[in-house]
């Protein structure tokens, strides 16, 4: 897409005019859609509180990215899982997160999301293992990159504390 399109989209976003973003993107022919546009469209739906259309937007693009379908699909499944978890649909959230994992994602964020989801599904032992794995991944990253990730560790520890308190 050209600079003029993105300037318009960014201005709408800065002004909180997410309905206008949706209208602009919906005008585009399907062959102009890419992962960046799908991301903006999905986020706009979320900002409007229209979670069903956000989810449908992400799911409709799975397998369609022209440049890097695997990484796009990993991101889309991750986003679908996060979205479902945010609205309390933990079964579907877990399913989508596991799809991202099957495609090769195995980082602290994914393991934390899966751990939270499992905890809310009362699968406590599995949840603890995932969250403990997240902590190990963060600690390895800290050693490798020399920066402290205290906030993330505190969040995960609080989730673990909730699970151990059950």
Where are these regions (language model features)?
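Register position in tetratricopeptide repeats
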Residues: 14, 47, 83-86, 120, ...
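Start-of-helix register in tetratricopeptide repeats
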Residues: 3, 36, 71-75, 109, ...
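Short coil turns that delineate tetratricopeptide repeat
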Residues: 32-33, 66, 71, 105, ...
């Amino acid at each position: 897409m050209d600079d003029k399109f993105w300037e318009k989209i960014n201005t709408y976003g800065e002004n909180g005019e997410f309905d206008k973003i949706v209208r602009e993107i919906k005008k585009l022919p399907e062959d102009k859609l890419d992962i960046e546009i799908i991301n903006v469209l999905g986020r706009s739906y979320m900002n409007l509180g229209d979670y069903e259309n956000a989810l449908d937007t992400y799911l409709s693009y799975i397998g369609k990215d022209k440049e890097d379908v695997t990484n796009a699909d990993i991101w889309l499944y991750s986003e679908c899982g996060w979205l479902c978890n945010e609205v309390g649909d933990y079964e579907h959230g877990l399913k989508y997160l596991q799809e991202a994992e099957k495609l090769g994602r195995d980082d602290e964020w994914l393991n934390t999301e899966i751990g939270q989801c499992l905890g809310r599904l009362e699968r406590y032992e599995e949840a603890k293992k995932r969250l403990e794995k997240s902590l190990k991944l963060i600690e390895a990253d800290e050693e490798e990159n020399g920066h402290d990730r205290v906030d993330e560790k505190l969040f995960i520890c609080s989730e673990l504390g909730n699970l151990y308190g059950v």
